[in-house]
């Protein structure tokens, strides 16, 4: 289940952009960032993802689809989503080795996985705070509504997966629909949990990663390995992991005993969830963000949760206390620099640090931050971040008197903005806000 990113909440309420437009920018052939992982860490993360639900409930046994898997888009899905699904299915076949293919939508003979697009308000009414979600043993929204609360819709009760339905927001940007597609299809095919301490996975509610990563593909390859099967418990799966990982990640080293202890700090998770949740006054959100940071420090967290605590605090403090936000972003960047596989996190923080530099008139620093982060945003296929960084770079170049370069970067910002934002007017407002951070900013971003 994908939580609603706070900075994109307004995008879901805006009129939908025409995502069927043929000249929307494309990322082309995927070139995912390659993350380096030990087999020991993969084994422990896999077990934590596979035997616990996001709510904290234990899953007694794994369940999965057995045999070839078919996926169908319901007629409500925008045409542009078909191309995104095709790219994703190709990756799942080539990177995760899953026998999966698209098929035509049929009500009388449904695919194993059906993808339906609905108004965001209907999704939020059914599952508050979720931008999108996946449910078992259903193929339509009506079927999901009929069986809500029954044991058939409980992931933890399954012994095998036969059908699943994914519900995406039809009135969102193409990027948000695609991001939902990646996370929900990933959960339909594999683990059901999210872990905040993962740095290289979409199975993490920090929303840094937009698409399934190479690490996620390894998790899915493990989950669907022939030596595993539906109904296996923790001990059986753990016993088979060393051989599986030795085969699919031969440079990852050996797996010793696997630590199965619960890694979730529920007090921290609750505090960060409240800080990022909707419909809460900013002052209270700031209090919850500070509480999450305090818990992380008291608990001696040295993983991504500490970095994310600082990042969340910085985002929330930005409007009312830029100095406090700047200090929080600097701390977050320092922590992520010490952790492996955090290029994407550092690109997001670079956007914030660069924007603060722009606001104080330091065009050189803003240009450095944006130029460094842009290649990571492109490889991680985050159009929203690409558009924002491109506008940051354009404004810095303008301030340095490099007008022709600024115009090229500005045009790139608007091109990717059409993919990353739900509405053209919202895109212009957001990108204009970045341009207007600079002292004596030109109004070129509004033209």
Predicted regions and their residues:
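Structural motif corresponding to the intra-repeat A-B loop/turn of tetratricopeptide repeats
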Residues: 319-322, 353, 360, 400
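Disordered inhibitory propeptide/activation segment of secreted metzincin zinc metalloprotease zymogens
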Residues: 1-70
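TPR/TPR-like (Sel1-like) alpha-helical repeat modules
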Residues: 329-334, 368-375, 398-421
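Metzincin-family zinc-dependent endopeptidase catalytic domain
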Residues: 82-182, 187-188, 192-198, 307, ...
């Amino acid at each position: 289940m994908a939580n609603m990113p706070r900075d994109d909440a307004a995008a879901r309420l805006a009129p939908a952009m025409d995502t069927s437009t043929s000249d929307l920018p494309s990322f082309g052939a995927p070139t995912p960032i390659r993350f380096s992982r030990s087999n020991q860490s993969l084994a422990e993360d896999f077990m934590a993802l596979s035997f616990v639900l996001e709510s904290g409930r234990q899953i007694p046994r794994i369940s999965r689809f057995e045999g070839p898997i078919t996926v169908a888009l319901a007629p409500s899905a925008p045409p542009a989503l078909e191309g995104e699904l095709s790219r994703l299915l190709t990756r799942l076949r080539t990177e995760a080795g899953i026998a999966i293919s698209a098929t035509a939508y049929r009500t009388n003979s449904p695919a194993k996985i059906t993808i339906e697009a609905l108004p965001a308000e209907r999704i939020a009414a059914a599952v508050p705070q979720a931008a999108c979600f996946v449910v078992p043993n259903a193929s339509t929204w009506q079927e999901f509504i009929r069986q809500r609360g029954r044991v058939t819709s409980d992931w933890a009760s399954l012994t095998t997966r036969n059908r699943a339905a994914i519900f995406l927001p039809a009135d969102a940007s193409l990027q948000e629909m695609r991001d939902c597609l990646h996370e929900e299809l990933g959960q339909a095919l594999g683990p059901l949990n999210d872990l905040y301490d993962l740095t290289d996975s979409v199975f993490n509610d920090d929303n840094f990663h937009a698409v399934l990563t190479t690490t996620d593909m390894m998790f899915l390859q493990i989950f669907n390995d022939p030596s595993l099967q539906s109904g296996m418990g923790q001990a059986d799966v753990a016993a088979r992991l060393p051989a599986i990982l030795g085969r699919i990640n031969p440079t990852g080293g050996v797996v010793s005993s696997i630590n199965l202890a619960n890694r979730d700090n529920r007090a921290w998770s609750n505090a960060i969830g409240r800080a990022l949740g909707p419909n809460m006054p900013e002052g209270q959100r700031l209090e919850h963000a500070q509480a999450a940071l305090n818990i992380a420090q008291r608990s001696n967290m040295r993983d991504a949760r500490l970095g994310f605590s600082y990042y969340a605090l910085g985002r929330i403090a930005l409007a009312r206390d830029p100095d406090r936000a700047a200090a929080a972003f600097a701390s977050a960047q320092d922590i992520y620099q010490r952790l492996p596989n955090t290029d994407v996190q550092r690109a997001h923080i670079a956007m914030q640090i660069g924007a603060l530099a722009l606001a104080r008139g330091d065009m050189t620093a803003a240009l450095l931050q944006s130029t460094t982060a842009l290649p990571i945003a492109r490889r991680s296929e985050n159009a929203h971040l690409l558009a924002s960084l491109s506008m940051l770079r354009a404004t810095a170049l303008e301030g340095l008197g490099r007008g022709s370069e600024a115009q090229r970067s500005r045009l790139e910002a608007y091109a990717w903005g059409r993919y990353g934002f739900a509405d053209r007017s919202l895109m212009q407002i957001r990108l204009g806000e970045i341009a207007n951070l600079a002292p004596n900013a030109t109004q070129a971003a509004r033209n």
